[in-house]
Amino acid sequence: MEFLERTYLVNDKAAKMYAFTLESVELQQKPVNKDQCPRERPEELESGGMYHCHSGSKPTEKGANEYAYAKWKLCSASAICFIFMIAEVVGGHIAGSLAVVTDAAHLLIDLTSFLLSLFSLWLSSKPPSKRLTFGWHRAEILGALLSILCIWVVTGVLVYLACERLLYPDYQIQATVMIIVSSCAVAANIVLTVVLHQRCLGHNHKEVQANASVRAAFVHALGDLFQSISVLISALIIYFKPEYKIADPICTFIFSILVLASTITILKDFSILLMEGVPKSLNYSGVKELILAVDGVLSVHSLHIWSLTMNQVILSAHVATAASRDSQVVRREIAKALSKSFTMHSLTIQMESPVDQDPDCLFCEDPCD
C-alpha cells in the first residue's frame, strides 16, 4: 500500500501493529504472529512498508512479560506486607512502642499503595480508545504519585505523634518485645526490598528502566527498611538504658526525614515524564548524531523524545535526505539504528527533501540547552 506522505511509525502494542499517515488518515491494523513477522526473513522488511524491530523478542511478548513480572512483584510484596503489618500492630501494642506502631502504620500505607499500584497497572493494560489514543499507560504514573502523597500524609501524622511523646513523656515501653518485633520487621523489609528490586539489563546490555509502580513500591519498602532498622536501634538503646526512652520518638523523626528524602528523586523523575521531558536514559544530542550518521541523511529537525511511562520511550523526527538516496531505504536504516541502540516504544520518522527545510521556521530550530 502506498501512502501520500512518507511518514513512518513503529508502535509496539499488545498483539497489534499500527501504521499511520499524515494526510490519508488511514489505519492498518493486523495481529502480530510468526507468519507475518518472522525474524529470519529480512527480505520482507525491504519489500514491506514497515520495519518493526523486535530486538530479539516480540514486543507483545515483552510487554506481557513486563506486566506479569510487575504484577507478581506487587502481589508478593502485598502478601508479605499484610502478614508483618498484623504482627507489628499486635507486637507494638504489647510493647507500648510508638516507633513499632508507626512502622506498622507505614506498612498499612505500603499495602494500600501496593494495591493501588496493582489497580493502576491493570488500568494501564487497557487498550487505547478514540479519546485516549495512547491508552491508559499513565494511570500507572498517577497511581505512583498518589502513593507518594500517601507517604507524606502518614509521615506528617507520625511526626505529630512523636512530638506529643516528647511533650508528654508519661509512657512505658517493653524493650524486649520491641526488640523481637523490630528484628522481625527488619527481616521482613529486607525480603520486601529484594522482591521489589528490579534493576536489570535488557537486550544489547541496555539498562531497562524500572516499572513505575514497582519503583514507587520499592521506595516504600526502602523507607520501611530504614524505619525498621532505626526502631531496632532505639529498642536496643531502651533495653540497655531504660531512661533513654526518648529514643522512641526520635527514631520516628529520623525515619520521617529519610522517607521524605527518598521520595524526592522519584518525584523529580515523574515530574519530568509528565512534562514530556527527554528520558534520563537518553541524550538528545546523542540521538540526533546517531540519525545524522546514517548514510543519506542531510539534516534533522523537529526531533522530539518523550515517554509514556518509565520504560516506554517515544521519538519523532523530520529528516531531510539526499536526492540520490531512496528515502524509504534511509528511513529503514534510521529505524534499525535507533532500535538497535535504544529501547523504543514508538518511532515516527517523516522523510523530507532539502527544499522543504525552512531555516527561519521556529518549529525547526534546535531546542536550547
UniProtKB/Swiss-Prot annotation:
Major location category of this protein: membrane
Gene3D superfamilies: Cation efflux protein transmembrane domain
Biased composition (Basic and acidic residues): 32-44
Source taxon at top rank: Eukaryota
One example GO MF annotation: zinc ion binding
Keywords for this protein: Antiport, Cell membrane, Cytoplasmic vesicle, Diabetes mellitus, Ion transport, Membrane, Metal-binding, Transmembrane, Transmembrane helix, Transport, Zinc, Zinc transport
Keyword Zinc (UniProt): yes
Chain positions covered by the region annotation Disordered: 31-52
Residues involved in Zn(2+) 2 binding: C53, H301, H318, E352
Pfam families with a match to the protein in the record: Cation_efflux
Localisation per UniProt entry: Cytoplasmic vesicle, Secretory vesicle membrane; Cell membrane
GO cellular component, one term: Golgi membrane
Quaternary structure annotation from Swiss-Prot or TrEMBL: Homodimer.
Function: Proton-coupled zinc ion antiporter mediating the entry of zinc into the lumen of pancreatic beta cell secretory granules, thereby regulating insulin secretion.
Protein name: Proton-coupled zinc antiporter SLC30A8
Natural source organism: Homo sapiens (Human)
Phylogenetic placement of the source organism: Eukaryota, Metazoa, Chordata, Craniata, Vertebrata
